[in-house]
């Protein structure tokens, strides 16, 4: 039986793909910059995660079902969910996303409202299909968070990051 990796930190995810960690509780992901390319792994998420998949690179198994996604779709995962991923060998990864730890949103409006985002539900195994305009909005939200992560952590960091994540999630609800 394959070992299940406990994904309880942003750094753990970044280690898996050879990406840099800028903040201990949140990370903006660009898999085209990955330096490691695992082809088969099972993750037990301890984080929230949203990924805009720009290529169908293999299968994602969510429970006993295959996650329904294609190019240009958003997949989402929440703490406690176990996901098996099989990446087709030789496929260049192309996905953008965000990972954030539940501790980041404690005491924020996002923390109070996180359960309203139904796409994080374990029962959901369908990806959100985006139009070109919606993809631009998704990527723009990630860019704002990424810019904030490039600054040293200060008294405003948590508020600005969590509000921008909340904006991204609200857009995903609209889509």
Predicted regions and their residues:
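A cytosolic small-molecule/anion-sensing beta-strand core signal
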Residues: 54, 70, 79
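Short acidic-glycine-tyrosine-enriched beta hairpin
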Residues: 64-76
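Generic protein-terminus/edge-of-domain signal
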Residues: 1-61, 65-67
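Histidine-centered metal-chelating micro-motifs
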Residues: 75, 79-85, 105-106
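Short beta-strand His + acidic residue motifs that chelate non-heme Fe in jelly-roll/DSBH
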Residues: 59-61, 83-90
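A hydrophobic/aromatic-rich effector-binding and dimerization subdomain
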Residues: 16, 20, 86-150
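An amphipathic alpha-helical interaction segment
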Residues: 133-175
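Conserved hydrophobic/aromatic beta-strand scaffold that supports enzyme active sites
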Residues: 28, 74-76, 97-99
């Amino acid at each position: 039986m394959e070992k299940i990796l406990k994904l309880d930190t942003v750094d753990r995810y970044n280690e898996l793909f050879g990406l840099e960690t800028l903040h201990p509780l949140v990370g903006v992901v660009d898999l085209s910059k990955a330096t490691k390319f695992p082809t088969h792994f099972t993750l037990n998420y301890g984080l929230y995660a949203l990924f805009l998949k720009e290529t169908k690179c293999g299968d994602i198994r969510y429970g006993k079902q295959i996650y329904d996604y294609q190019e240009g779709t958003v997949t989402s995962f929440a703490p406690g969910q176990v996901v098996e991923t099989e990446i087709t060998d030789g496929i260049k990864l192309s996905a953008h996303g965000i990972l954030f730890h539940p501790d980041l949103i404690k005491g924020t409006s996002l923390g109070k409202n996180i359960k309203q985002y139904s796409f994080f539900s374990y029962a959901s195994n369908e990806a959100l299909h985006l139009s070109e305009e919606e993809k631009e909005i998704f990527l723009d939200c990630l860019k704002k968070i990424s810019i904030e992560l490039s600054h040293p952590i200060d008294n405003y960091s948590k508020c600005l990051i969590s509000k921008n994540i909340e904006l991204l999630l609200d857009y995903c609800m609209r889509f």
